[in-house]
Every structure is written in C-alpha cells, then in structure tokens.
Amino acid sequence: MSSPPPARKGFYRQEVTKTAWEVRAVYQDLQPVGSGAYGAVCSAVDSRTGNKVAIKKLYRPFQSELFAKRAYRELRLLKHMRHENVIGLLDVFTPDESLDDFTDFYLVMPFMGTDLGKLMKHETLSEDRIQFLVYQMLKGLKYIHAAGVIHRDLKPGNLAVNEDCELKILDFGLARQADSEMTGYVVTRWYRAPEVILNWMRYTQTVDIWSVGCIMAEMITGKILFKGNDHLDQLKEIMKITGTPPPEFVQKLQSAEAKNYMEGLPELEKKDFASVLTNASPQAVNLLERMLVLDAEQRVTAAEALTHPYFESLRDTEDEPKAQKYDDSFDDVDRTLEEWKRVTYKEVLSFKPPRQLGARVPKETAL
C-alpha cells in the first residue's frame, strides 16, 4: 500500500479519534471537543495570538448533492454573520491544493467552552445571569432575523457560552427538513414552536422567539417547560399552559387536518404564567407571556422583545448592529456535485478574516 502524500506546505497531519485531520500549522494542540451528525470539532491554539479556537471538520461534505448543498450553505452563512452573539468565522481553509483534489475544508471559529444545556445541568442560574443570557439571545436573533435568516432549531445545546457568560448562537438556518433523512438524527421538539412541529403553515421568524421563551422558562424553573413524548403529546403539553386557541386562530391554519384536530380538542383555560414560573420576577413573567403565544402573528419579535422593561438595565441600542440581507437564492439551486464543489471551493478561497484573527469585529464593520 502506498503511503499518503506528505502534508501540504504550511500544514500538518494528525489523527483525532480515528479521523485524519490536516490543518494549518498555525493551529497547534488539537484536542477533540465533540462530534455531531455532520462533523467533528477540535479545540486548538492559534499560535499567532495565543487564543483558543474551535475547528470544525465536516464529514465527507461532498458525498452527495444534499450534503454538498448543506456544507455550502453552512459556509456562506458563517461567512455572512458578523455579530458578537452569533458564531462567525475566524478562518476557513482546505489542505487540498486544487479544485480537482478538493474533498475537505475546515471552519475555524471562536472557542466558547460550554453550551447552555451543560451549564443548566451543573448550576442554578441567578436572575441577573438569566437576564443577560436572554438579552444576548435576542440581540443575536434580531441580527439573524434582519439578515432574513430563521434559526428553526434553537435549543440550549446550540447556544455556546464562555466563562464570562458571553453567548453565541450556533447552527442557525441549517435545520431543514432533510436533516432526519440524511442522518437519522431525531430533532428535539421540546423547544420547537407548535407551527413547526405540526407543519401548520408557512412559519416566520417568531418560531425562534417561541424557542427563547421555552429556554428562558427552563432557566428560571430548572425544568423543561413542554416535555412531550411525540408531536401530539407536545401540543397537549403546550396547551395545558397556553390554553386552547380561539376559533379565529384555528381558521388561519392551512391544513384541514390540523383544523379538524384543533376543533375537536376539549377547551382548556390559559394558565397564569406566574403560577408556573415560581421565583420569576413580574417583568420576566410578562415577557414570557408575550413570547409563548400560540398565534405566531401575535408573538413578540426579537426587536420588540429587546425594548421590554425586563432588559432596561442592560439595553444599549448602539450595541445592536444592522445586518445585511443574506442572499439565499444560491442555496436552493439544483447543481451537480461537481458544481457544488466548485462554488464551495470559490467561497473557501475568497474568505477574508475579520481585521484581526480572534479580535472582536469593530462595530463599524459588523454589518
């Protein structure tokens, strides 16, 4: 058997959990951090700055058109996002020297240390920390939504947190219907808005606000708010608190099946949120009542939620940069595998890092 060619100049090879990694020599001390449905993550130290970074390697991104399309979208979304509460790219590189050889690329992002799910398992969060974390979630969402992107799968596990309680939203805009077909992974539905779980209608950005409400309630009580065993059980759990919706809401549902189901439900009164959320301040309860509304059209937006009195002590409107619209017209084009490869390779090569690797992006460039 012939041995593999030597690593590209300026790169080195290392095996990490039975996978060959070939990374730029500036990234030292590769340590496995975790792996998911689509890729693995290592921490490393950027030898130029001494900063710890996270490097993600996608599993065989060009194994099919579907995987290639997803990899391309992830790269373009990460390149687009420049906000302190949204994960963005510090670097992207490929060890492959030409388009013909192109099979892998690596995404370099800030290293955050933990996620909100792990944090909640290990400690009870004070009201101040809850307020600061929710404020950052909403700032990140306001920016993502202004870019025209919907997260679709916000949950504690994809909210990265560092030791200073600074939060960044991960994996935005990637949760598409193809996920379970591609990987067999079942998506957690406990944080998903009812209109997403049941495919009621074309959903809007407020699906993410529902998720923030579920996460905020869990931080306050230490318990998952709506823990259904399946789709319909999830809806029952939700309605035990929100009550059954009025007839005018049921009329808006686009699916006849959903309409019939809703009309057949026994009537449930809305619960007083303060009784469910013991220990929560009146302002926190009021904010949650505006987030956890069955009718998505009546739900508060991220921009509106940020003006709520609950955040009065934190709000800094100067600190809410505007986003440029993300152009997703490229993402849904039908392309051959070779074409996906070509456009992805072009995106990798055209990446320009933030002014200083590892530095916070200055406000005037945070567009």
Swiss-Prot record:
Gene3D superfamilies for this protein: Phosphorylase Kinase, domain 1 (3.30.200.20), Transferase(Phosphotransferase) domain 1 (1.10.510.10)
Positions carrying Phosphotyrosine: Y185
Gene Ontology biological process terms, A to Z: myoblast differentiation; negative regulation of cell cycle
Annotated binding of ATP, by residue: V33, G34, S35, G36, A37, Y38, G39, A40, V41, K56
Keyword tags: ATP-binding, Cell cycle, Cytoplasm, Kinase, Magnesium, Metal-binding, Mitochondrion, Nucleotide-binding, Nucleus, Phosphoprotein, Serine/threonine-protein kinase, Stress response, Transcription, Transcription regulation, Transferase, Ubl conjugation
Chemical reaction(s) catalysed: L-seryl-[protein] + ATP = O-phospho-L-seryl-[protein] + ADP + H(+); L-threonyl-[protein] + ATP = O-phospho-L-threonyl-[protein] + ADP + H(+)
PTM annotation: Dually phosphorylated on Thr-183 and Tyr-185 by MAP2K3/MKK3 and MAP2K6/MKK6, which activates the enzyme.
Tissues showing expression: Highly expressed in skeletal muscle. Also expressed in the heart, particularly in cardiac myocytes, lung, thymus and testes.
InterPro entries reported for this sequence: Kinase-like_dom_sf, MAP_kinase, MAP_kinase_CS, MAPK12, MAPK_p38-like, Prot_kinase_dom, Protein_kinase_ATP_BS
Main localization of the protein described in the UniProt heading: cytoplasm
Cofactor: binding comment: Binds 2 magnesium ions.
Active-site residues per Swiss-Prot or TrEMBL entry: D153 (proton acceptor)
Motif (TXY): 183-185
GO terms under cellular component: mitochondrion; nucleoplasm
Listed SMART domains: S_TKc (SM00220)
Pfam families: Pkinase (PF00069)
Keyword Oxidoreductase: no
Subunit details: Monomer. Interacts with the PDZ domain of the syntrophin SNTA1. Interacts with SH3BP5, LIN7C, SCRIB and SYNJ2BP. Interacts with PTPN4; this interaction induces the activation of PTPN4 phosphatase activity.
Domain description: The TXY motif contains the threonine and tyrosine residues whose phosphorylation activates the MAP kinases.
The family this protein is said to belong to: Belongs to the protein kinase superfamily. CMGC Ser/Thr protein kinase family. MAP kinase subfamily.
PANTHER family: MITOGEN-ACTIVATED PROTEIN KINASE (PTHR24055)
Name used for this protein in its record: Mitogen-activated protein kinase 12
Organism: Mus musculus
Gene (name only): Mapk12
